[in-house]
Amino acid sequence: MDKKALKVIADAMLEKKGQDVVSLDLKPIGTAISDYFIVCNADSTPNVVAIADNVEERMIEKCKRKVIRTQGKENAFWVILAYGDIVVPVFQTPYRAFYRLEDLWADAERTAYED
């Protein structure tokens, strides 16, 4: 897995005002469903959708990678984009606080991204 994709995803999230962008390196944790999670939150449904759409567009444009599966765009309380080795959850702020995905993998190496 190339770190370029994580940077492209983080930049795409930040371009559309994603908040608290954090990636988790799950490779050392043998039970994880992917190598990386990169998560953020936003304050509104339109913002969640805009972030997810921008991630998809930037990954095609800069990494030549299409999303394998998308879930959650119907109600957009959260949207998950699956790229196989990378899972990209985008939450509305209260849902991120409720699900606390980062706490599931507290041992994972974390990287925070900022503008």
Where are these regions (language model features)?
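Active-site beta-strand termini and strand-to-loop segments that position acidic
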Residues: 81-83
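Polybasic/polar functional segments that serve as interface/processing modules
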Residues: 1-33, 42-79, 93-94, 104-115
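Switch/connector loops and helix/strand junctions flanking conserved nucleotide-binding motifs
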Residues: 97-100
